[in-house]
Amino acid sequence: MKFQARVLTLYPEMFPGFLGYSLAGHALERGIWSLETVQIRDFALDKHHSVDDTPAGGGAGMVMRADVLAAALDHCPQDSPRLLMSPRGRPFDQAYARRLADDSGITLVCGRFEGVDERVIEARELEEVSIGDYILSGGETAALVILDAIIRLLPGVMGNKASAKCESFENGLLEHPQYTRPSLFEGREIPPVLTSGHHKAIADWRQSQAELLTRQRRPDLYARYDKNRQKT
């Protein structure tokens, strides 16, 4: 079944962007997923195609209008999750991507300006999601990131299923270091265990390295991993 992605945006020309290349691009050509962009401005109510207005109560910037965005949302099918790109949203992670990849599609709303009128978020039950604790010029970049994370998990996109299972975050840890030829680079050798041919020793080394890296670089992830490990 084809995964259907819809993006509501003021800049449809930004899509598919880098998703037109590599794994996602090939999957798009093969029909594993489809992309529809919806120009929010097409649902404006005045001759100037206005989509924003000044914030109630005063303040800097402009706010996207609830009536215009609601009309754009109502134009789309209601059978898939509807996510609003927002820095105050739930953090996006690998588990979130896996859950979304199991659905039949997704609708992504790309905000601009100072934000979106809260009433349309409530009335259309938009799920706010964030890709990090920083501010972007608009939601389009975040939407592309989220789609990329989802698409690579769709059946048939990655040639080797084991590749996805061994990546960072899939087992609660960062990925172990990777090496390839040449065997010697500027005086640095590939760890001998990786060329030993002993599969269990290699697996044990990779596991220990993944745990070490996670403990050093992401103590928050390691604490969660260690807690889950103690439960099993």
Curated annotation (Swiss-Prot):
Lineage of the species this protein comes from: Bacteria, Pseudomonadati, Pseudomonadota, Alphaproteobacteria, Hyphomicrobiales
Protein's UniProt name: tRNA (guanine-N(1)-)-methyltransferase
Assembly information from the UniProt record: Homodimer.
Keywords: Cytoplasm, Methyltransferase, S-adenosyl-L-methionine, Transferase, tRNA processing
Catalytic activity: guanosine(37) in tRNA + S-adenosyl-L-methionine = N(1)-methylguanosine(37) in tRNA + S-adenosyl-L-homocysteine + H(+)
Localisation: Cytoplasm
Function: Specifically methylates guanosine-37 in various tRNAs.
Disulfide bonds: none
Main location as per UniProt: cytoplasm
NCBIfam families to which the protein is assigned, alphabetical: PRK00026.1, trmD
Class of this enzyme: transferase
Protein family (similarity comment): Belongs to the RNA methyltransferase TrmD family.
Binding residue positions for S-adenosyl-L-methionine: G111, I131, G132, D133, Y134, I135, L136
EC number from the UniProt entry: 2.1.1.228
GO MF entries: tRNA (guanine(37)-N1)-methyltransferase activity
